Amino acid sequence: MNYKQPLIVKSQQQALSALRNLKMQTQDTHLNQFFSDDSGRFERFSVEQEQLVLDFSKHRIDQNVLNGLVDLAHAQDLTQWIQRLFSLEEINYTEQRAAMHWALRVPEQNQQVLPEITAQVHTQLERMYSLVEKIHAGQYRGATGEVIQDVVNIGVGGSDLGPLMVTHALSDFKVVTAKPLDVHFVSTMDGSQLSDLLHQLRPETTLFIISSKSFGTIDTLSNAQTVRQWLEKALGKNSHVLKHHFIGVSTKPDKMSEWGIAPENQLLLWDWVGGRYSLWSCIGLPIALTVGVDGFKQLLSGAYAIDQHFQTAPFAQNIPVLIGLLGVWNNNFLDIQTHAVLPYDGRLKYFAAYLQQLEMESNGKSTQRSGEKVDSATCPIVWGEVGPNAQHAFYQLLHQGTHKVSCDFIAPVKRYNANHFTYAENAEALIEQHHLALSNCLAQSRLLAFGNQALTADEIEDLPTYKQYEGNQPSSTILLKELNPYSLGMLIATYEHKVFVQSVLWNINPFDQWGVEKGKEIANQLLPILNREQDDLSTFDASTQGLLKILLGKNNG
C-alpha cells in the first residue's frame, strides 16, 4: 500500500468532504471495474499478520478512497485515542471508568506496563489456573467426596456469550482429564435451559460457576437460586454443600459471600473490565476448563499480539483499523447498514452471536461524547450464521434481494491434522469436506462481488432475469492459518479494536450500555403484578394493561 501520513493532517470536515467527493466519483463503479482497472488489487488490498490474513480487495474502494479513510482516522485523532485506550484514563466517561480489557492479556513478565495492575490480574489468573488443574486432576470433589465431572457456567451477556463461543470454537483442543469432564452453559432467565440440563446431571458430581460482574443480574441469580435448591434438596441445606459446588466470578466479593460462596471459591474482576470484553479474565474459567491452562495462555497471547499490532502498525497496514474504516465507508458513505458475519467452520457457530453483542451493545449509540446527537449512522445491524448453513437460509437475499449487505467471510486454511482423527480412515474424507467448505466460501464471496461476471459465457447466454446476479456486494475475507487458541485470540481482539476504531470516528462511547438498563427497571415494576403482590395497573399504557390482564387471566374475552 502506498499511503503515507500527510505532513499536514486534514480537519475532520475536510476529510469528510473529500470522502463524499470520492463517493460521488466511485458510487457507480462496479467491483468488476475496480478489478479490471488494477491487476495488482489483491496485493494492494490485503494484509497478513502472523496467523491472520485480511483480504479487503472486494470492497468498493480504490487507493484514493483508502487514503481518504486513513486521512479521516488521523483527523479524528485515532492515534491519540489508541494511546488513551492503552492507559489508565477513564475513557468510559459516563461510568467514570477506564476500559482496560487489554490489561488482562499483558504477559506476567512484562513489568513495564502498569506493574501493579498486571500483578493483580495475574494473581487472579493464577488462582483460576490452580482451580483448573485441580479439577482436571480429579482432585476437586463435591460434598459427598465424589469427583466433579460436570461444570455449569451460569451467566448472561458477556459472562456467557464469550466463554460459550470460545469453548465451542476450540472444541478440537479439549484437554484430556483424569475423569471425563463436560462444561455446560445456562443463560436464559425462563429456566428452560436449566430444566433440560438438570435431568442429565448428578448433584454429587456437578460444580456451578456463578459468573456475574455485578452479582446482581436477575437472570443469573434466578438460575443460581434454582440450582441451589436442586443441590440442597439432594445433598442437604448447609454451607458444606455451597462450598463444594459453587464458584463465583464477580467484582463484588461481599455479594458473593452474602449469597454463600466461600471466599476461597471467589475469583475477582475489576470495574475497568466491560462484560462483553471479559472473556480474558476469570470469566473465561469455562474456557480454561476446556482447553487447559496452556491453551488459555495461548488465547491471551494471540490477543496480546493484536494489541501490539494495533498500537504500532501504520493505519493502512493495521488490520483492526482497516476493518473499522471499511465499515465506516460502507455504513456512512455507501449506505450499507446491515453486516453479515459468515464463518465457514462449524466450530465458529456462536461467533456471529458473540459479535452481535460486542458490536451492537458497544456502538449502538446515538449520543456523541459531547452530549449532542450524532449526525450520521452508527453501528449497522450485525447478524450471521455458519456459512454452509446460511447458504440454505438467507443467501438468496444476499444475492438477489433488494438490501445492500456487507459481509465478513471467515475460514481456517488448515482444518484437520493427525491429532483430530478418531479413525485414520476418516482422514481423507474429512480433509475433502474442509476443502468443500473453503471452495464454497470463496465461491460465495466471488459471486457476491462480481455477479454475472463470475459465470461462464455459456451460462450467461439467454439467462432469464430471475437467474441473474447483480453482484457488487462488498466483503472481507479473513483467513486463519489454523483455528487454534492463539489465532482465535487474534481474531477476537481484532474485532474488539475494530469496534473502538469506529467509536472514535463516530465520537461515541463504546464501553457503556445505558439502553439496556431502563428495561430491567420497568420489568421490576411489572414482576410484583405478575406475582399477584400488587394489582394496580393504572400506571401502565393500554397495551401493557391488556397484556397483563391476559397473563393474569382477567380478560373478558
Curated annotation (Swiss-Prot):
HAMAP family xrefs: G6P_isomerase
Organism ancestry: Bacteria, Pseudomonadati, Pseudomonadota, Gammaproteobacteria, Moraxellales
Keywords, in A-Z order: Cytoplasm, Gluconeogenesis, Glycolysis, Isomerase
Protein species of origin: Acinetobacter venetianus (strain ATCC 31012 / DSM 23050 / BCRC 14357 / CCUG 45561 / CIP 110063 / KCTC 2702 / LMG 19082 / RAG-1)
Protein name: Glucose-6-phosphate isomerase
Function as written in the Swiss-Prot or TrEMBL entry: Catalyzes the reversible isomerization of glucose-6-phosphate to fructose-6-phosphate.
Coiled-coil positions: none
GO molecular function: carbohydrate derivative binding; glucose-6-phosphate isomerase activity; monosaccharide binding
Family of the protein in this entry: Belongs to the GPI family.
Domain of life of the organism encoding this protein: Bacteria
Gene Ontology biological process terms from the UniProt entry: gluconeogenesis; glucose 6-phosphate metabolic process; glycolytic process
Catalytic activity: alpha-D-glucose 6-phosphate = beta-D-fructose 6-phosphate
An example Gene Ontology CC term for this record: cytosol
